[in-house]
Design a protein with these regions (language model features):
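Membrane-interface junctions at transmembrane-helix termini in multi-pass inner-membrane proteins
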Residues: 4-32, 51-54, 75, 220-251, ...
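Membrane-proximal transmembrane or re-entrant/amphipathic helices at the cytosolic face
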Residues: 298-300, 322-383
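Interhelical loop/hinge segments that connect adjacent transmembrane helices in multipass membrane
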Residues: 53-57, 71-114, 153, 157, ...
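Helix-loop junctions and terminal segments of transmembrane helices
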Residues: 20-21, 79-80, 136, 140-178, ...
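Alpha-helical transmembrane segments of polytopic membrane transporters and translocases
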Residues: 4-5, 65-66, 102, 117-119, ...
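Interfacial segments at transmembrane-helix termini and the short loops linking adjacent helices
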Residues: 1-2, 192-223, 296, 330-331
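Hydrophobic alpha-helical transmembrane segments
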Residues: 29-78, 99, 250-258, 269-291, ...
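Helix-terminus/linker motif at the lipid-water interface of multi-pass membrane proteins
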Residues: 45-50, 104, 111-142, 160-161, ...
Length: 383
């Protein structure tokens, strides 16, 4: 089943790229939402009726293919693309091959970065240790996946403006996009740092906290720095300037494996986490911001201030609220965990609302429209 899924997934995946290139993100989102909900409902149905893991696997493999097929039909309707060997252009094929080979290098490097840990830990420690490592690492992955999904839209946008030579818009995407990524990533980081022990206890049990929480902290900080620059990453793909990123990512992946092997014996799973964190931090701190700022003609100081000053400041109320809630009502189970997180999110939401309405142009315009609407309603009533 997995083999058939891979074989069909490659050609069907082109349709998703077409929709992204056309900037029809709402179609991508709706197909994702419907496909995910359908998969969840079917899996629950199968498990409740005792149909076995094979049925679950069939649903898990089939639903993404159906979603991709629906996207292919939508893309065909939008573009009415003709098919045939006479439409194959060698120059375009060469361009796609060059772009794809560099992208493949980055994919391989990403697998070395995040997927090699289980092999190393299983080889040098034990299979049981993989579970303790994976709990902390998976929480970091969940947070990063949210931001990565958000940043997907910047690839076709940056490709469009780079093709037209509009560097002013590219700089605007660079600043506002990374700021948006930080506004999403920073509160998740704060929540995991302060409430990570409670999350692990409620999710997996108290016995995993002492081993998994240090892994979470070690991986979370460099991952936050990297994910807060997700727009930079996607823009490099959009502008087809990701070759340097590919070489750096490969060096990072090799360094990750080497350091993890070197440190896993004396330090255990913490050593493996350190071996992953150090190369990732170097990429996020020393390569990615400098490379992007050089490409777009922006100073590092301007980049850091414009993208990260307000997102960092706005987390202060959330930090205070979460620390207070954890001190007064420490969360051991999901209900209290949700309550504490809701209080922290509410505090952060107030700050973000203030920022949007006073600092962002569309928020200021929205506030002005609302003020005019209210004054227009009050005026006639008073008359």
């Amino acid at each position: 089943m997995v083999g058939y899924s891979l074989a069909l997934g490659f050609p069907l995946g082109v349709s998703g790229g077409i929709l992204e290139g056309l900037q029809r993100f709402y179609l991508m989102n709706w197909t994702n939402i419907v496909g995910t909900l359908a998969r969840a409902v079917l899996i629950i149905y199968v498990l409740r009726h005792g149909l076995g893991l094979l049925s679950v696997a069939l649903i898990t493999v089939t639903l993404p293919l159906i979603t991709a097929a629906v996207r292919a039909m939508i893309a065909q309707r939008l573009l009415t693309i003709p098919y045939g060997w006479k439409y194959v252009d060698r120059g375009s094929l060469r361009q796609v091959a060059n772009y794809g080979s560099v992208t493949f290098m980055i994919i391989v490097a990403a697998r070395m970065r995040f997927k090699s840990d289980a092999v190393i830990i299983g080889s040098f420690l034990s299979a049981a240790a993989i579970t303790h490592f994976s709990i902390g690492a998976r929480l970091v992955d969940y947070a990063g996946e949210v931001v990565s999904s958000l940043a997907q839209i910047f690839t076709p946008m940056s490709s469009h403006f780079h093709a037209t030579g509009d560097f002013k818009q590219l700089r605007r995407i660079f600043i506002t996009g990374n700021r948006a990524c930080a506004l999403v990533m920073f509160p998740m980081t704060v929540a995991l740092i302060i409430m990570g022990k409670s999350v692990i206890e409620a999710w997996m049990g108290a016995r995993y906290v002492i081993t998994s929480y240090p892994v979470l902290l070690i991986l979370l900080i460099p991952s936050t720095i990297y994910q807060a620059q997700s727009t930079s990453n996607r823009m490099l793909f959009g502008m087809s300037l990701h070759k340097a990123l590919a070489y750096v990512a490969l060096m990072e992946g090799v360094s990750n494996v080497a350091l993890s092997i070197f440190l896993v014996r004396p330090l255990g799973i913490v050593g493996d986490a350190i071996g992953t964190a150090i190369p990732l931090a170097c990429t996020a701190l020393f390569f990615l911001p400098r490379h992007m700022c050089r490409q777009l003609g922006i100073s590092i100081r301007e980049f850091v201030y414009e993208c990260y000053f307000y997102p960092a400041v706005l987390t202060a109320p959330m930090i205070a609220v979460l620390i207070l809630m954890q001190h007064r009502f420490y969360a051991h189970r999901y209900p209290q965990l949700v309550l504490n997180l809701a209080a922290g999110i509410a505090a952060y939401g107030v700050g973000v609302g203030w920022y949007v309405l006073t600092r962002e142009s569309f928020g200021i315009q929205l506030k002005d429209r609302f003020s005019r609407f209210v004054s227009g309603q009050v005026g006639p009533a008073e008359q």
